[in-house]
Amino acid sequence: MSGYERLKSREVSRLCHFTKLQNLTHILATEDGIIASGSIQQDTKNVNDIARYDGELDYVCCTIEYPNSWFLNSAIRSDIDKIFKDWVVLCIDLDVLLVRSAKFCECNASKAHGQFIQSDFENVDQIFADRVSSFQWPRTPKMLPCCPTNGQAEVLVKDNIPRQFITGIIVGNFDIAERVYAMQKFYGISKIPICIAPDVLSTSWSGMIKQGNRPQEQQYLWPEEVEL
């Protein structure tokens, strides 16, 4: 069974990648989508590109089902940009793993400078074990089967994630949702669903999924679809 098939068997519906709202313009502008840090121009990099302690500059870091909100919060605190302060989470179709090679890590890939990263993606189900060596807390009995034992576990996707595999954009409030909508209209791309889910951008989701629950994700209604 391939790593892709193992994730599908656990009903994993998506990968997640967070980025600054201002970066979304670069991502939506071309079919290349999300580009690995090593290929990004220096002037468009931000804190989560620069601080790549895992050394995997040719890979795009993603998490499974929900974002690494702990690292996201750290990135927000470390960000010296006082003008462009908003972040979003991109939802990635699992089918990207059919066209891109990948590695995985049972924890944050930067832990111990990447020592926990594994190249044999067929063994990705290890991240769902009752216990993983790099994480002190065991898996809870009610935990959603699609979520890894350590919420910071990662899938590293080679080179880039083409725009066609971005299936959703999660934001923290209505104001950001409207700006994301405006970006999509400006670039004239097919509608990518937008969800408002503050619990997903915080670490609140972690406690929920350990009890078998999901945080609420409210669909943003495109203005032209709202009945007057």
What are the residue ranges of the model-derived segments?
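Active-site-proximal loop/hinge segments that shape catalytic or ion-binding/gating pockets
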Residues: M1-C61, P67-L228
